[in-house]
Amino acid sequence: MSKKQTKDKANGAKATKTIALNKRARHEYHLEERYEAGLALQGWEVKAIRAGRANIVDGYAYVRSGEIYLIGAQITPLIQASTHTVPVERRDRKLLLHRAEIDKVLSRVEREGYTLVPTALYWSSNKVKLEIALAKGKQNHDKRDAAKDRDWQRDKQRVMRRHNRDA
């Protein structure tokens, strides 16, 4: 182990490495509160995630019998995956959250019409974590407004750079 890695671990810094991002979620939804959840995975899934074969773009989470499950996320099995189990790419995966967090999320989803959307999948100290966000769907005019604001910010930066360069 190198000196830098030893120093980082000695200082208590948690190393996080992003596995998959859901960039479409920011475009399709207004994201509000974010939660970090663990995932109940099988062995072949962890191995496939280490190989970078995870996709959370089509995924969403829902509450069933007081527990939260991730639906639609795809973990493609490796060819040399376990022979004694049949890997299912898009199976329901249980999310591990504290009871208070589950209750809070459940109330917002049921009463206020929020959706649970996965935004990032990453390693946190040798454990796979999923960041989920409470989200409300954007309508087309909201998406157009966001694009217009983004273009305006870009143009403004361009004008400021040009002005500062000439001055």
From Swiss-Prot:
One of its GO terms (biological process) is trans-translation. Residues 139-158 have a biased composition (Basic and acidic residues). Its main location: cytoplasm. Required for rescue of stalled ribosomes mediated by trans-translation. Binds to transfer-messenger RNA (tmRNA), required for stable association of tmRNA with ribosomes. tmRNA and SmpB together mimic tRNA shape, replacing the anticodon stem-loop with SmpB. tmRNA is encoded by the ssrA gene; the 2 termini fold to resemble tRNA(Ala) and it encodes a 'tag peptide', a short internal open reading frame. During trans-translation Ala-aminoacylated tmRNA acts like a tRNA, entering the A-site of stalled ribosomes, displacing the stalled mRNA. Residues 139-167 are annotated as: Disordered. Keywords: Cytoplasm, RNA-binding. One of its GO terms (molecular function) is RNA binding. It comes from Xanthomonas axonopodis pv. citri (strain 306). This is SsrA-binding protein. It is found in: Cytoplasm.
